[in-house]
Regions:
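N-terminal pre-domain/capping segments
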Residues: 4, 18-146, 166, 177, ...
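Bacterial N-terminal signal peptides
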Residues: 8-16
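Acidic/histidine-rich catalytic cores of soluble enzymes
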Residues: 36-40, 177-275
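Hydrophobic faces of well-ordered beta-strands that scaffold small-molecule active sites
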Residues: 40-46, 69-71, 109-114, 152-154, ...
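Active-site-proximal loop/turn and secondary-structure-junction residues that shape catalytic pockets
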Residues: 48-50, 73-75, 116-118, 156-160, ...
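Short, electropositive alpha-helical surface patch
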Residues: 123-141, 163-176, 205-222, 245-253, ...
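Active-site groove signature of glycoside hydrolases
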Residues: 144-165, 186-201, 295-296
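Active-site clefts of carbohydrate-active enzymes
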Residues: 258-269, 290-305
Length: 322
């Protein structure tokens, strides 16, 4: 779809949604726009720390077509030195508060974005440190059972040193197998997200994280148990449809955002700032049989834009297909 058409359509739909509510986007003042409902539910990533889990905010999101959330911001519970910041009792109380509000608003917790960083890296070479990462991440997963998430999402690594990639892969696989057992014990599915890596080197002393290309993601996923799934982030790789098709039914979750494949842009897909071809992406999601939420991890102005944008992308895809 031409980008100018996308922008024009988005401007029009956003105007209709603003002036008369998201439900009425089907009727244009002068011309009739028949928009078909898209197949997936809509979700978006919200941090634990802010006010997004307050009941009124969750209710608002639900009222404009959001059914799921991914919970991020786990740094509210654990610091970058792997120390829990709160007592377990306090963590449980906060999680219960969030779950109660989500239930009352009718919002389901689809996924948890687990914490990441140099000292929370599943692929650490030092065994004492790696075991401590697994222990702390595992304990956090057990506490997060309160939220009844379906998906627990991990980054495969942080930045790597030079020429240690193979060793890091082996360490990641060890950690993932161990954490997968904890994730299974709370009736959730573990997924590992592809990360940004347009070139191997981040700078002269560091390599980009693991799962930076389609080929590397395939290689590592093939070495992991089948019960561990893949999460495809649309702003971490150029032409994400290629990764979606390579993962197929192994893909259990997504991060919807636009970008250039070179930076952590997390642009809103209808902003026309990124380079993704959403028709190709939606076709790939269809072909892969993905049935989870259309989970935004992107900038947005207002929650009401999330469903409107997905609906527009979906109708563009339908019109391009036939
Ligand atoms: Zn992501």
């Amino acid at each position: 779809m031409k980008r100018s058409v996308l922008l024009l359509t988005w401007t029009f739909l956003a105007f209709v949604a603003c002036s008369s509510g998201a439900e009425e986007t089907k009727t244009a003042p002068t011309d009739k726009v028949e928009l078909k409902d898209p197949p997936l539910k809509v979700g978006y990533s919200i941090p634990f720390g802010g006010d997004k889990f307050e009941l009124k905010n969750l209710k608002y999101a639900k009222s404009v077509g959001v059914d799921y959330v991914e919970v991020s911001g786990m740094s509210a519970f654990i610091d970058d030195q792997r120390n829990f910041k709160l007592s377990e009792l306090e963590i449980k109380e906060r999680l219960k508060w969030a779950k109660k509000n989500a239930d009352e608003a009718g919002i389901k917790i689809w996924s948890i974005h687990m914490p990441f960083g140099a000292n929370l890296d599943l692929s650490l070479v030092n065994e004492t440190n790696r075991r401590d990462v697994v222990a702390k991440q595992g304990r956090l997963v057990e506490l997060l059972e309160i939220l009844e998430p379906q998906i627990i999402l991990f980054h495969p690594s942080y930045y790597l040193g030079l020429n240690e990639r193979d060793l890091r892969k082996a360490q990641l696989i060890k950690s993932a197998k161990e954490l997968n057992e904890v994730v299974k014990s709370i009736n959730a599915t573990m997924v590992i997200e592809n990360l940004l890596g347009p070139e191997l080197l981040k700078d002269e002393n560091r390599e980009r994280p693991l799962l930076r290309t389609v080929q590397e993601t395939i290689e590592i996923m093939n070495r992991l148990p089948n019960s561990i799934g893949s999460a495809v982030d649309m702003n971490h790789i150029k032409n994400p449809e290629e990764l979606i098709l390579a993962m197929g039914s192994r893909m259990k979750s997504v991060h919807i955002a636009d970008g250039t494949g070179k930076h952590e842009n997390h642009y809103f897909p209808c902003s026309v700032k990124g380079q993704n071809d959403w028709t190709l992406i939606l076709a790939a999601l269809d072909k892969a049989g993905y049935r989870g939420p259309f989970m935004y991890e992107s900038a947005y102005d207002d929650e009401k834009d999330l469903m409107v944008c997905y609906k527009m992308l979906y109708n563009n895809y339908l019109n391009a297909s036939y």
